[in-house]
Swiss-Prot record:
Cell compartment(s), UniProt: Plastid, Chloroplast thylakoid membrane
Intrachain S-S bonds: none
Topology relative to the membrane: Single-pass membrane protein
Biological source species: Stigeoclonium helveticum
GO annotation terms (biological process): photosynthesis
Record's function text: May play a role in photosystem I and II biogenesis.
Taxonomy, superkingdom: Eukaryota
Stored Pfam families: PsbN
GO cellular component: chloroplast thylakoid membrane
Family statement: Belongs to the PsbN family.
Keywords, alphabetical: Chloroplast, Membrane, Plastid, Thylakoid, Transmembrane, Transmembrane helix
Protein name: Protein PsbN
Keyword match Plastid: yes
Keyword ATP-binding assigned: no
Length: 44
């Protein structure tokens, strides 16, 4: 457990997990109401 690579790996794993969770929250949670949809803005 004194290996710095172990702590770096844990930190990197939690960092990537938090970025993924935040992007899912923004994409599907309450902030998604403010996102614009370019397909709805485009008129045929």
């Amino acid at each position: 457990m004194d290996n710095p690579a172990f702590f770096f790996t844990i930190f990197l794993w939690f960092f990537l997990l938090s970025i993924t969770a935040y992007s899912i929250y923004v994409g599907f949670g309450p902030p998604s109401k403010r996102l614009r949809d370019p397909f709805e803005e485009h008129e045929d």
